[in-house]
Regions:
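Surface-exposed, polar/charged faces of alpha-helical domains
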Residues: 33-113
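N-terminal signal peptide c-region/cleavage motif recognized by signal peptidases
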Residues: 15-18
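Short N-terminal segments immediately surrounding and downstream of signal-peptide cleavage
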Residues: 22-37
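Bacterial N-terminal signal peptides that target proteins for export
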Residues: 1-9
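Generic structural signal for short, solvent-exposed loop/turn connectors between secondary structure elements
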Residues: 21-22, 75
């Protein structure tokens, strides 16, 4: 068993697979409460979910950086792919923050009435 594992491990090492497995965090589990009707507890729960998503996305972006740094000589294509993935992650975080902030403004406007 061990003898068959060693050649497989060596083959995988030189197969060109990325050293890090940077997985894009899904946003589908993040629920943002409707600020027009939400309670304070629901808004705080939404804030916690958005912050948790942001932390996961920041870890993803950090992983992308480590992944490209691990390559001895990254190709132009590898750098471009890293930049695309990085920019998509930043855009997703900005979109999530804006969606949450819209609901916060609705919530605060409702409280001021």
């Amino acid at each position: 068993m061990v003898k068959s594992f060693i050649p497989l491990a060596v083959a995988m090492l030189f197969a060109g697979a990325p050293l890090f497995a940077c997985e894009y965090p899904p946003a589908d589990g993040v629920k943002i409460a409707d600020g027009a009707t939400a309670t304070e507890a629901e808004m705080l729960e939404s804030q916690q979910a958005v912050n948790a998503y942001r932390r996961k996305m920041e870890a993803f972006v950090d992983c992308l950086g480590r992944e490209i740094e691990a390559l001895e000589e990254p190709t132009v294509e590898a750098r471009q792919m890293r930049n695309l993935r990085h920019n998509a992650a930043v855009g997703a975080m900005e979109d999530m923050a804006e969606r949450f902030n819209v609901q916060v403004r609705k919530y605060r406007a409702r409280l001021e009435q």
